[in-house]
Amino acid sequence: MSSGQSSSSSGKAGPQEPPSSAAEPAYRSPGLRGVRTTSLFRAVNPELFIRPNKPVMALGLLALSVCVGYLGYLHAIRDSDQQLYEAVDSDGETYMRRRTSRWD
């Protein structure tokens, strides 16, 4: 009977707490917010520790999209603009003429 009493007195039969209850808060804060770092590292890399601001990210994505669209527009205008040039004929009149290659 002493073996039965020793097993119940050791606490194995009842509910047990997990041994790493102190490490549990590290799992609750995802990312680098829960990691212990120096204040210098946090000052140099603040974007790793602050919560993302979704309206600011949406505004930045919109601005980047507008810039890329404008660059595409300028590229299209430049290509169509290079195909024509102003030529002067023997009478002195000017007209627009399509560029031709000397190799054709």
Curated annotation (Swiss-Prot):
Superkingdom in the source lineage: Eukaryota
Membrane disposition: Single-pass membrane protein
Pfam hit, one: DUF4500
GO cellular component terms listed in the entry, alphabetical order: membrane
Subcellular location: Membrane
Compositional bias ranges of the Low complexity kind: 1-11
UniProt keyword annotation of ATP-binding present: no
Keywords: Membrane, Transmembrane, Transmembrane helix
Annotated spans, Disordered: 1-31
Residue spans crossing the bilayer: 55-77
Family to which the UniProt record says this protein belongs: Belongs to the SMIM8 family.
Protein name: Small integral membrane protein 8
Organism: Danio rerio (Zebrafish)
Gene: smim8
